[in-house]
């Protein structure tokens, strides 16, 4: 039985490493675009901004989820994998916010109108989420599972609060 667990852990780790390499390449491209152009100039059409923010939020959720799975004991804790996911999370957590500009409230989006009606409240929620995710990143890089566990709860609550207030189900 122990051999099966060991094999499973190795397979999960290898899968995570393969996914990480592909994700790092994608994030690198996204990051390059994000840094190369002013926020509004990035998007030729509102649909482009919506796609961009949805993609960056999806990547952010994937890496947060991987860290959460380790914190919850659903997958074995691996300090290197945690740090690698944290590196991606640190970059991606900065990306989606510029894509909530004017005209991006319509189309294929679950964004609520409150994002634009209560823009200061939305900015505060986004800033809080980024701050909490920064704590997750720092905790993951320590290699200490307990530190990661402690940081995940507040970050998850921050994400949930933003979703509850600003995202349609």
Where in this protein do the model-derived segments appear?
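Short, Lys/Arg-enriched N-terminal segments with co-localized hydrophobic residues
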Residues: 1-19
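Secreted/extracellular small peptides and ectodomain modules produced from precursors
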Residues: 5, 17, 33, 157-160
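Intrinsic low-complexity/disordered segments
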Residues: 11-13, 37-39, 60
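Sec/Tat signal peptide C-region and signal peptidase I cleavage site
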Residues: 19, 35-41
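N-terminal leader/targeting peptides and immediately adjacent processing regions
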Residues: 26-27, 40-45
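Bacterial N-terminal signal peptides
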Residues: 27-34
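Sequence context surrounding c-type heme c attachment/ligation sites in exported
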Residues: 43, 47-79, 85-169
């Amino acid at each position: 039985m122990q051999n099966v667990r060991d094999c499973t852990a190795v397979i999960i780790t290898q899968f995570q490493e393969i996914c990480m390499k592909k994700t790092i390449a994608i994030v690198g491209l996204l990051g390059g675009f994000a840094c190369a152009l002013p926020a509004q100039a990035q998007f030729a059409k509102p649909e482009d901004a919506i796609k961009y923010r949805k993609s960056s939020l999806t990547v952010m959720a994937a890496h947060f989820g991987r860290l959460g799975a380790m914190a919850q004991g659903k997958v074995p804790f691996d300090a290197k994998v945690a740090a690698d996911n944290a590196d991606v999370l640190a970059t991606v957590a900065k990306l989606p916010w510029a894509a909530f500009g004017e005209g991006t409230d319509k189309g294929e989006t679950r964004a609520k109108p409150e994002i634009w009606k209560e823009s200061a409240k939305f900015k505060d929620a986004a800033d809080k989420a980024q701050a909490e995710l920064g704590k997750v990143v720092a905790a993951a890089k320590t290699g200490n599972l307990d530190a990661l566990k402690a940081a995940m709860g507040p970050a998850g609550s921050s994400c949930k609060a933003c979703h509850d207030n600003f995202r349609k189900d």
